[in-house]
Structures are given as structure tokens and as C-alpha cells.
Amino acid sequence: VRSPNGKYIGGVCYGENAGFIFDVREQKMVKYAAPDPDTDVQLKGIADNGVAVGWNGPAAIFDFASEKCTTYGEAEQYLFTGISPNGKLIVGARYDGTDDEGTPCLFNEGVPTDLPQPSNKFLGAESAGASALSVSNDSIISGYWVDAMATRPALLWAPNRDGETFSAYPFSRGYFASSYESTMPYSIFSCDQTTMSANGKYVVLNVEKLLDDGGSEFGVARYNTENDLVEYFMASQLEGMEDSELYGFAVSDDGTIVGCCGSLYSGRTGFIWKKGETLQTLAEAFPKVAKFAEYDAGGMNSPCGISADGRYIAGFAFVDSETADEDSEETGGMTTWFFDTLYETNDVAAAPASEGAGKVVARFSADGKRLNAGSKVRGFNMLLMKNGKTMKTFNK
């Protein structure tokens, strides 16, 4: 994740059970270790002041300035998924055992306020719950509701005139195909990656178009909260990648979207889609940056953050190296990268890796056969990390 002002990036450390926040300008990293090996750590959103939210077992706030992680409640009681650019508002959910999806909430100074959920009658389909994912400074909230087909149609909440209560607006209702018998052209679902621009104007959506033959194609959409219009870019519009999938992960205040094409579980190629322009891979949009082609070749290039002004982009990728680590027969590992689109040398930089983070100790083919050091086969490769965890990559 990247803060709207471009100063901070945050995520998880590969090769160890910890989260991190990195100050791009000061070149300083703060890590937040999990209390034990079985505890999951995730950073889901970060504000301009270096305060991030996510979970470290229970819901958690990660503060760059104090270098402290503060947890709230018990594990699985609360979930923090987004924070406003000014760091004052947090969105997520609370769980009391009555709703599998939880109750969407706005947290203001640690106090949860339940967000209303639209009725099944209004939705035209049965809802199993809802979730809030991101929030702007003026309390516009984006998220989704969950239907019987387990998709996640997009949903907005906006404050009422009293400034305290909210109304739900399922803007995807006019585009959502609730079944394969539906005459609606699109099934708009937002998944966990969907976020809103810092100014609350745009929402990036992942889209599945149902085809007449019973199949589907995937694309990305840009929703304008001010005029209720949706723009689409489908995978079929990409030459040579018609059968791939598109996933948008972040959007700037001017509607620029970054994400990846390929698949969440196979080869990923980073893309940028500026408003009024054609979607391009990062390697096409910035041909002087050789690193982007290298990251694409690694099969895991995933731009996942963009600053509010669209200048700074951050992501992660798998990168090969020519030499193996002394305690590994394999080369390469995961890297977190950040890029200034106006930087005069048109180069891309990597965040400093934690000691041992992202190291790959062995590689296996899809059928479980161990590969020789440095060798690769087409298709899925399974990587064994130094900490015992595994990760899939896809080689073209």
C-alpha cells in the first residue's frame, strides 16, 4: 500500500513474519513483528502521516513515528481495512458471531459505528453481508456486499445531512448480473483489492462480463462517484492477452489506475490505465525503465499503490539474481519497488530488504519435482522461502 502523498509504502516482509512501513524520502524502514509464528500480519491502508491499519492477530494500527503497533479487541473481533488520507477515520468490520461476513463499520477514534446494509428487496438479490474497504477525508466509504454467488458487487456509503448517520448506495445494482439467466451485461465485484481515490471521486473495480456461451471475460472499471458513470477496459482489448484477467489495485485523484494483467495466481504483468487513454503495461508506458520488463519476466509484477497526484507508484515483484545466497541453492527473491514517474533518469528503486527476507531456498515444478538451482520450467513454479513458506510463480 502507498500513502496518498507518496511518502510512505507499507506491506509484509517476505521471508519473515512481520509488517513494515518505509519512508521513501528519508529512506527509513520500521518493522512490526508478529507475536508468534502463527499470527498473520497485514497492512491494508496507510495515511499521509505514516499511520497504517490492518491486523497483527487482532485489528491493529501501525504508527511509523512511534514505531509501535497497537491492537484492538480480540482476534477476529474487529477488522481494519482502510484509513482516510488524514488518518482520522478507519473502516472495516466487527464480528459478533451473528454474521459470517461481519458488520461493516466506521471507526472514529476507536469507536465503531455500524454502517447500514441495503435490503434484499432493494438489491434484487439475497445479501450475505457487506464489508467496508476504503474511506475519504469527507467520509465517503467504498466496499461491497456479498451475494448468493459469492461475488462482491460494489457498494458506497455516504454521510447523511446530520453528519452522523450513513446511507448505503449499491451503485453496481444497474450492472450486476445476479445469475447466469440475468440480462445484465456485467457482474461488478470488488474483491479485497478495491479502493477509492483519496479525494473520493473514483473507485477502481474488477469486472467480469458474462458471455453468451456461458463463459466470461475479465476487465477493470473506473467508477465516478460524482456523475455515477462507469468506464471499462476488458482483457479482450489487449492484443495477445485476450484470455488474461485484469485486476486494478489502486486509483489516483485523476482516475489513473494501476494493477496487473494475467492472473492473481499465474504470470502477472504490471499495467497503468490513465483516464482518457488506452491501458498500457508499465514496460510500454515507461520504455526507458528496463526494470519493469525484468519484473514482468519474474511473473509476479504487481503495482498495488499510487499517490493521490498520480506521480508515485509502488508494487512488488519477484526478481532473479545471478548468484545464490550462501544458505540457498536458488537465486532471486521478492522485492518491493517504488517509482517516481517524473524522475529524470526514469529509473525504479527498491525498498531495502530485511535480513533474510524474500530468500528462496528451493524451486519445484508444478508436479512437485525439485528443479536444479537456477533452472525454470514454463508454467507454475513453486518456491520454498527461507522461513518455510511457499509461493507460486509463473514462467512464460
Where do the protein language model's features map onto the residues?
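Conserved "turn/edge" positions that cap or connect secondary-structure elements
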Residues: 1-344
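C-terminal outer-membrane/trafficking sorting elements
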Residues: 347-396
